[in-house]
Structure formats: C-alpha cells, structure tokens
C-alpha cells in the first residue's frame, strides 16, 4: 500500500533539482515494530519533507533571527528482547551504566498492546537517552522468562533497576491513563 507523493510546483521551485515525484517509503509489517525508510528533501532552510509525512517548518523568527530547532526524536522505537539471555544482557548492561530500564510485555494478538505501543514510543522519546525502553512478545520468548518477570496480563509495563523489578503498570484501561501512570512510575523512580 504505497503511494507516490506528487510535489506541488511551489515546493519544486524551492529546490529545482528535486524530482516532482517522491518515491514511496519502505514499510514492512511486523507484530510490533515497523521499520521505516524515509526519503528526505531540504528546501532552503524553510521546509523539511519526508515521504511519510510532509511538515513545513519556518526557522526564521519575525525579528529576522534564526530559531533553534529541537532535534530530539518524536518517538523512539522500543528495542525487542528475544529471549532470556538477551533479557539478562539488557539488565546487565543497564546495571553497569546505573540506568533503569522499562520493559513492555506484549502479545501480537493483544489489541490494547498494539494500540498502546506507539504512545509508549512517544513517551520513550521524552526520556531518551537516559532511559531505555524495550518490548517483549510473550509468545516469542520462553514461558520461564514471562513467569520470572511475574507477568500475568497484557500489556504490562515494568520498571527494572539493578536487575530487580521496581514497579509495574498493567495497561488494561485507556491508553492516555496508562501512559500517565508509566510517566509517574518513571518519575517516582528518578526521585528515589
């Protein structure tokens, strides 16, 4: 389901070297992640164009000065955890760095999990890079790992520090409530 985006003549006039047609971006479907390849074009410091979304950004202030653009990510893809050894490695790495880790336990068949994931990716961007977010597909890892983490419902979002579970949110209700609870969980951990 790819589209060719036809650039208007006004956009083409800003950068005459650009083709009037922007090729489609690659999108592969997966149970949880959607890798994306974008095609970016610049137009004289005024407009940034990506084939997935078109966004105009005016970087000149009214007084003629330049406005700094925030280059922090809008969302950060949750890193997959594929098994017990990988889970242990993530915990060990975080412990060495003295960081906490957020683990989102999901299932491919869980509609609430699928709906919540992009919202958690946006939340992950707020705490990036000091806090890493990962996801585990409970059907793709051994049951020992799921049991070890104490997961009984999906989605379950857990905060881990020093190899120990510190707190968890079970996300069976509205996504914005879950995201707020996860945010509070993270902020409460950073206070202690």
Swiss-Prot record:
A Gene Ontology term for the protein's cellular component: chloroplast stroma
Location in or out of the cell: Plastid, Chloroplast stroma
Cysteine-cysteine disulfides: 110-113
GO biological process: cell redox homeostasis
Primary location class: plastid
Extent of the transit peptide: 1-55
Domain Thioredoxin span(s) in chain numbering: 66-191
Keywords: Chloroplast, Disulfide bond, Electron transport, Plastid, Redox-active center, Transit peptide, Transport
Active site: 110, 113
The organism's place on the tree of life at top rank: Eukaryota
Classification via CDD domains: TRX_family
Known function: Probable thiol-disulfide oxidoreductase that may participate in various redox reactions.
UniProt similarity note: Belongs to the thioredoxin family.
Matches recorded under PANTHER family: THIOREDOXIN-LIKE 3-2, CHLOROPLASTIC (PTHR47192:SF4)
Protein name (Swiss-Prot/TrEMBL): Thioredoxin-like 3-2, chloroplastic
Source organism of the structure: Arabidopsis thaliana
């Amino acid at each position: 389901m790819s589209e060719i985006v036809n650039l208007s003549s006004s956009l083409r006039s800003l950068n005459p070297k650009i083709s009037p047609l922007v090729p489609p971006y690659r999108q592969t479907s997966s149970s949880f992640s959607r890798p994306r390849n974008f095609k970016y074009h610049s137009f004289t410091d005024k407009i940034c164009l990506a084939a997935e979304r078109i966004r105009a950004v005016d970087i000149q202030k009214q007084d003629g000065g330049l406005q700094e653009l925030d280059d922090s990510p809008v969302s950060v893809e949750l890193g997959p955890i594929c098994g017990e050894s990988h889970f242990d490695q993530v915990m060990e790495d975080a412990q060495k760095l003295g960081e906490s880790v957020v683990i989102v336990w999901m299932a491919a068949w869980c509609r609430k999990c699928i709906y919540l994931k992009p919202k958690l990716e946006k939340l992950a961007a707020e705490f990036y890079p000091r806090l890493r977010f990962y996801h585990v597909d409970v059907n793709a890892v051994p049951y020992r790992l799921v049991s070890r983490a104490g997961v009984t419902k999906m989605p379950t979002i857990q905060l881990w520090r020093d190899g120990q579970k510190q707190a968890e949110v079970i996300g069976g209700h509205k996504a914005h409530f879950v995201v707020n609870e996860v945010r509070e969980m993270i902020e409460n951990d950073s206070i202690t």
